[in-house]
């Protein structure tokens, strides 16, 4: 038993140091892991503190850039410790406090536009001015964008190992631009762009970058012509079609190729000959027609009639499928058009100078228009208002007496329409002198004497039957009552009456001119407004004779005021009347008119038939 117990106890003693070694190894690894974790934690904390410190420094720089009197050296030094986001915050904060967004500018923002886009008539482009609103000028906007593009986009806490950029500032001599251009339409794709897509991308990038260099003082660009495929929608399918055609042509043989080349050569020759023609040269028309006739004669001599028809159809199809399409204008033709426009401008200037040299033509036209207007305005009511209510009876009395002396007893029985021409002419003389006759002034023809006699007999018969008790009220009375009820119409209200609207327009135009003319008379517009309104009510106004220029309204006001002065009690030889006359003379001289011209307008309302 003792023998068996010895080795087991020895094994236990040998296993004890192994366990202790394992425990010591685990303790060492755990301590190493703890040290690494603490070290990483310390490094992470240091990195976070560094990041926070750099962010705090960047925010402090942003606050400093909000102040005024920023120098160029300080701005370039600050660019090393901020990002583009920080700089955009500077621009926004400065615009909020009504300062220009460019830190070097000390000006304040004025009236900020509310719209989002701006159309530039100089560059014919549309700009997004959302960012431009934060700056006082186009130069400050471009200078700010120029500086912002140089700021590194990397985080500020990893720039210690990087090379600091050399900042440059935009000089004041360089011009700015209005904002970010809005691409309204994409550029047309050419066949060369399909073959070389990288070249097209470079062109697109250069065109997009060139939009930022558009200045507010850009000059007009020259027109340039370009050659594009004639069929734009099918431009992508041109190359496979050409490939298939080439295969078919190889199979068909060289004969078809030679014919096709000959037709293309004739088309090219014709286009070259047409290119020699000009729009303004009539001498070269014959020279342009002769080569065309030669081409036609050659084709007709070499082919029969059906072949010529086929050739014409093929040529038309070639023109429809041709790859030559002019877009824009070449520089040569642009210069030609500029010369033509310069000639037209010279012609227009010569015409304007001739008008200035001959003011008599304009004066004659002005007086003609005013005479036509005043003649159309004048009515019998106008003359009654100016010369009294018995104006018409006084004028018609002598003519009526002459008519009565010529009448006999037999003339009373006959038709009066054939025996009263003088009376009717005298009654319609004023209306016939006008260029038109309104429906209100038209006079109905007088009924014949026989018809009047028959109507009186019928009325007497009805009266007798009524008193005898035989007359019965029939359907005629009810019909007349129904017709009266049906025909009753209401007059138009002032807001919808065209005549009232026209009178209001005339009064408004005269009210703007008259206050200056009433100064010599020492009266106000309110003193004569009632008489003026009553005078305008008598006019015959249309939609055409109330449209005049300011100078014409001034002359019309002078005519009407000279007509109203007797009604207002202002005598011509009084002191006020003499002052008013001198004032009108000076005013007419400024309008290059004479007193006789004003008298020729006022005489339209004068008449020889005055009341006794």
UniProtKB/Swiss-Prot annotation:
Gene Ontology annotations for the cellular component aspect, listed alphabetically: cilium; cytoplasm; cytosol; nucleolus; nucleoplasm; nucleus; transcription preinitiation complex
Residue runs in coiled coils: 33-68
GO biological process assignments: PERK-mediated unfolded protein response; snRNA transcription
Enzyme class: hydrolase
Catalytic activity: O-phospho-L-seryl-[protein] + H2O = L-seryl-[protein] + phosphate; O-phospho-L-threonyl-[protein] + H2O = L-threonyl-[protein] + phosphate
Polar residues biased stretches: 295-305
Subcellular location: Cytoplasm; Nucleus
Positions of post-translational N-acetylalanine modification: 2
Modification sites for Phosphoserine: 9, 216, 433, 480
Disulfide links within the chain: none
Binding residues annotated for Zn(2+), in chain numbering: 100, 105, 136, 140
Effect on the protein of changing residue 136 to A: Abolishes interaction with RNA polymerase II complex subunits
Region feature Disordered, mapped onto this chain: 1-38, 193-267, 295-317
Keyword terms, alphabetized: Acetylation, Coiled coil, Cytoplasm, Hydrolase, Metal-binding, Nucleus, Phosphoprotein, Protein phosphatase, Transcription, Transcription regulation, Zinc, Zinc-finger
Skewed-composition ranges (Low complexity): 206-218
Main localization of the protein described in the UniProt heading: cytoplasm
Chain ranges of zinc fingers (RTR1-type): 77-160
Composition bias, Basic residues: 246-258
GO molecular function, one term: RNA polymerase II CTD heptapeptide repeat phosphatase activity
EC number: 3.1.3.16
Family: Belongs to the RPAP2 family.
Subunit structure: Associates with the RNA polymerase II complex. Interacts with transcribing RNA polymerase II phosphorylated on 'Ser-7' on CTD.
Domain remark text: The RTR1-type zinc finger mediates interactions with RNA polymerase II complex subunits.
Role according to the record: Protein phosphatase that displays CTD phosphatase activity and regulates transcription of snRNA genes. Recognizes and binds phosphorylated 'Ser-7' of the C-terminal heptapeptide repeat domain (CTD) of the largest RNA polymerase II subunit POLR2A, and mediates dephosphorylation of 'Ser-5' of the CTD, thereby promoting transcription of snRNA genes. Downstream of EIF2AK3/PERK, dephosphorylates ERN1, a sensor for the endoplasmic reticulum unfolded protein response (UPR), to abort failed ER-stress adaptation and trigger apoptosis.
Protein name (Swiss-Prot/TrEMBL): Putative RNA polymerase II subunit B1 CTD phosphatase RPAP2
Name of the gene: RPAP2
């Amino acid at each position: 038993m003792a023998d068996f117990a010895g080795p087991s106890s020895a094994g236990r003693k040998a296993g004890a140091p192994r366990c202790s070694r394992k425990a010591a190894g685990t303790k060492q690894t755990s301590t190493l892991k703890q040290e690494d974790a603490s070290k990483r934690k310390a490094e992470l904390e240091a990195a976070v503190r560094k990041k926070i410190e750099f962010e705090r420094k960047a925010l402090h720089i942003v606050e400093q850039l909000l102040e005024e009197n920023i120098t160029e050296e300080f701005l370039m030094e600050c660019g090393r410790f901020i990002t583009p986001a920080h700089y955009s915050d500077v621009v926004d904060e400065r615009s909020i406090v009504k300062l220009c967004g460019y830190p070097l500018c000390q000006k304040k923002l004025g009236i900020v536009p509310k719209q989002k886009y701006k159309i530039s008539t100089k560059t014919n482009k549309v700009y997004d001015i959302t960012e431009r609103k934060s700056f006082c000028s186009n130069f400050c906007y471009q200078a700010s964008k120029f500086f912002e593009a140089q700021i590194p986009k990397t985080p500020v806490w990893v720039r210690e190992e990087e090379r600091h950029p050399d900042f440059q500032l935009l000089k004041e001599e360089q011009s700015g631009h209005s904002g970010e251009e809005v691409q309204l339409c994409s550029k047309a794709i050419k066949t060369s762009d399909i073959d070389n897509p990288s070249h097209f991308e470079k062109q697109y990038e250069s065109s997009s970058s060139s939009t930022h260099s558009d200045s507010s003082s850009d000059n007009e660009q020259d027109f340039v012509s370009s050659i594009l495929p004639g069929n734009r929608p099918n431009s992508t399918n041109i190359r496979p079609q050409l490939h298939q055609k080439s295969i078919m042509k190889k199979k068909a043989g060289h004969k078809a190729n030679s014919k096709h080349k000959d037709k293309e050569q004739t088309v090219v020759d014709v286009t070259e000959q047409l290119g020699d023609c000009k729009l303004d040269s009539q001498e070269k028309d014959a020279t342009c027609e002769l080569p065309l006739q030669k081409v036609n004669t050659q084709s007709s001599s070499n082919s029969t009639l059906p072949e010529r028809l086929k050739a014409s159809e093929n040529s038309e199809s070639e023109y429809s499928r041709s790859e030559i399409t002019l877009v824009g204008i070449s520089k040569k033709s642009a210069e030609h058009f500029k010369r033509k426009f310069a000639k037209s401008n010279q012609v227009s200037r010569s015409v304007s100078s001739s008008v200035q040299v001959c003011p008599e033509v304009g004066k004659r036209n002005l007086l003609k228009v005013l005479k036509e207007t005043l003649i159309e305005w004048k009515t019998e009511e106008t003359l009654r208002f100016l010369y009294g209510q018995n104006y018409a009876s006084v004028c018609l009395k002598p003519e009526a007496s002459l008519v009565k002396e010529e009448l006999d007893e037999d003339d009373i029985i006959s038709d009066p329409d054939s025996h009263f021409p003088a009376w009717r002419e005298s009654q319609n003389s004023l209306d016939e002198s006008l260029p038109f006759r309104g429906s209100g002034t038209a006079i109905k023809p007088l009924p014949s004497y026989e018809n009047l006699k028959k109507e009186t007999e019928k009325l007497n018969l009805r009266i007798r039957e009524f008193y005898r008790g035989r007359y019965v009220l029939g359907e005629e009375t009810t019909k007349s009552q129904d017709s009266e009820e049906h025909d009753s119409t209401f007059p138009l209200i002032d807001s919808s009456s065209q005549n009232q609207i026209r009178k209001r327009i005339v009064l408004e135009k005269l009210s703007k001119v008259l206050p200056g003319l009433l100064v010599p008379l020492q009266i106000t517009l309110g003193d004569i407004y009632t008489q003026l309104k009553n005078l305008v009510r008598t006019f015959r106004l249309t939609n055409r004779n109330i449209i005049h220029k300011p100078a014409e309204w001034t002359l019309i006001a002078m005519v009407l005021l000279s007509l109203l002065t007797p009604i207002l009690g202002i005598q011509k030889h009084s002191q006020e009347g003499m002052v008013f006359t001198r004032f009108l003379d000076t005013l007419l001289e400024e309008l290059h008119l004479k007193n006789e011209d004003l008298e020729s307008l006022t005489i339209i309302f004068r008449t020889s038939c005055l009341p006794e």
